[in-house]
Amino acid sequence: MGIENESPEPDCQKQFQAAVSVIQNLPKNGSYRPSYEEMLRFYSYYKQATMGPCLIPQPGFWDPIGRYKWEAWNSLGQMSREEAMSAYITEMKLVAQKVIDTVPLGEVAEDMFGYFEPLYQVIPDMPRPPETFLRRVTGWKEQALNGDAEAAPEPPCLPKEPAPPSLESQPPRDQDSEVFCDSVEQLEPELVGEEQRGALGGENDTRNSPEPPAEKGRLEGPLLGPQELDSWLVGTVRALQDSMRDVQGRLQSLESMPMPPEQMPPPSARPRPLRLSGPTLIFFLLWPFIVQWLFRQFRTQKR
């Protein structure tokens, strides 16, 4: 009974797998690129839905991207897998609506809408573009099938829905092998595509350096990519280590070098023994007795 309660509903899992398939197959240079916050939300919901609560340790300070991902996943706490799948689907709906509202209504937009078509079959309330765009995409497919691909624009390859993986059979992973995506669980368009597609501006093949999530999705321009940033950090740390070793070596060499004679401290003066003559020494030994004898003589005479 416990397993049945924990397993997600079939419809929810089917919708989740369709949404993951769409995210995986978004074009590398498409007209829409999710923001940094959206990428982190997709990543955290996917990890929660497939692996459960975050149990891996927090990455070190030298892995800022890994820390962002860990914090996003860890923030979900004890959210159930079904709730995470539902949240992933809800986020997918918001992204689809954002595409409809923001992407220019041109041929590129028609391309983009085609990638969401598998979701319309499994998610009834999925936001849809105007029917004219869907008809144009359908017309492209028919022309391609009829052999008129040269006379009409070639439609984009629609993503194929992968076979749903067994959630219980997935072993836990300590840390992602890639900078922003798992080597097997390629889910987010930018968590996968950031290191492959370039910055969010869409014109460079490098990714912005880690910035706060609210600003990351809006930055443009060639900044350090994740691999370049990692290489730079590793090089900096190694340079610091080399500098520390050099300083330690110099200190050890200075400590082992003999000091010049002019800087050597003078030898400590040893106390000289008290040299007294024999009569003087006898006087020092007998003077208390002499004083005592004289004092007694004085008292006797006084009486």
Curated annotation (Swiss-Prot):
Gene Ontology CC, one term: cytoplasm
GO molecular function, one term: fatty-acyl-CoA binding
UniProt superkingdom: Eukaryota
Compositionally skewed regions (Basic and acidic residues) per UniProt: 204-219
Pfam hit, one: ACBP
InterPro entries linked: Acyl-CoA-binding_prot_CS, Acyl-CoA-binding_protein, Acyl-CoA-binding_sf, FERM/acyl-CoA-bd_prot_sf
Phosphoserine: residues bearing it: S166
GO annotation, biological process: fatty acid metabolic process
Keywords: Lipid-binding, Phosphoprotein
Amino-acid positions noted as binding an acyl-CoA in the UniProt annotation, renumbered to this chain: 23-32, 43-47, 69, 88
Pro residues: bias regions: 153-165
Domain ACB, residue spans: 12-101
Region (Disordered): 148-178, 191-224
UniProt xrefs under CDD domains: ACBP (cd00435)
Function in brief: Binds medium- and long-chain acyl-CoA esters and may function as an intracellular carrier of acyl-CoA esters.
The protein's name in its UniProt record: Acyl-CoA-binding domain-containing protein 4
Organism of provenance: Bos taurus (Bovine)
